[in-house]
Amino acid sequence: MKSLPIALQLYSVRDELGADFEGTLKKVKEMGYDGVEFAGLCDKSFDEIKNICDNIGLSCVSVHISLDEVSANPDMIIDGYKSLGCKQITVPYLPEGVRPGEGGFDKTVAAMTAVGKKCKEKDMFFAYHNHDFEFVKVGDEYGLDVLYNTISSDLLICQLDTCWVNVGGVNPSEYIRKYAGRMYTVHLKDFVGQKTDNMYGLIGLKEDDGSGVKVEEFDFRPVGYGVQNFPEILKASVEAGAQWVVVEQDRPALGKTPLECAQMSVEYLKSLRVSDILKE
């Protein structure tokens, strides 16, 4: 089976990156990552970042940027990230009020369509990264399906976050296959614990669902150290035509630092390659 290159979403090491931008990227490369996905530039220029990444040997795969920000100056932002070698502009989140099924959704569709057209003109992908709230039904469909059925696949592709798909109650591998041919990247994220009624303030809290029984504490984990079936997720990603997998861990766990967690994730993924799960 095809071996997918591995990138790190730099939000995972945001504090380290802010303290030592170049040094942190060097460590990411030394761990064995092939590329990175940005979530801000740490006050660096595009030229500075390109020089640093080129010297280190890291590919710039994608960026997370708000819809409002990219809509305000699409040419500058798309051209800037394209100059780094990025192939994908990704909206990581939609605030309440503008999500599928809500009053401001038409505004979201118009803005995404406009940015998608700009990206298409510049030979870039425009993607949306889900959380769990898109798996609330809007009529007979999940909100995420409403989004992808409303905007055509040539203007908007998927960046499926496998943790949030699972938390939303859907099998990640099956959902990846559902959108085969509509993804450049897949987010690999692991976790333990259970969804609660007030999940989306969720992280690190034990919640009472009203039954008097405490549910297991939700927490993120390095890839391979939680509940996810990554061999199957990776197989589905390859079959669906993804070109990159992106590791993300919103906060560290198991008493490890963010960099240690990132290393645990990439070592686990490389162990799957060694065991032939991901080899040609």
Task: List each model region and its residues.
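N-terminal pre-domain/capping segments
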Residues: 1-88, 157, 235, 263-280
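A short, acidic, amphipathic alpha-helical segment used as a generic capping/interface helix at domain edges
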Residues: 225-238
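C-terminal/domain-terminus segments
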Residues: 242-271
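Tryptophan-centric aromatic hotspots in well-structured domains and transmembrane helices
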Residues: 10-13, 33, 64, 128-129, ...
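Acidic/histidine-rich catalytic cores of soluble enzymes
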Residues: 121-227
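Active-site acidic/histidine proton-transfer and metal-coordination neighborhood
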Residues: 67-158, 178, 259
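Conserved beta-strand positions in the central sheet of alpha/beta enzyme cores
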Residues: 37, 62, 90, 127, ...
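Acidic-and-aromatic substrate-binding clefts and catalytic sites of carbohydrate-active enzymes
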Residues: 14-19, 35-48, 65-73, 96-100, ...
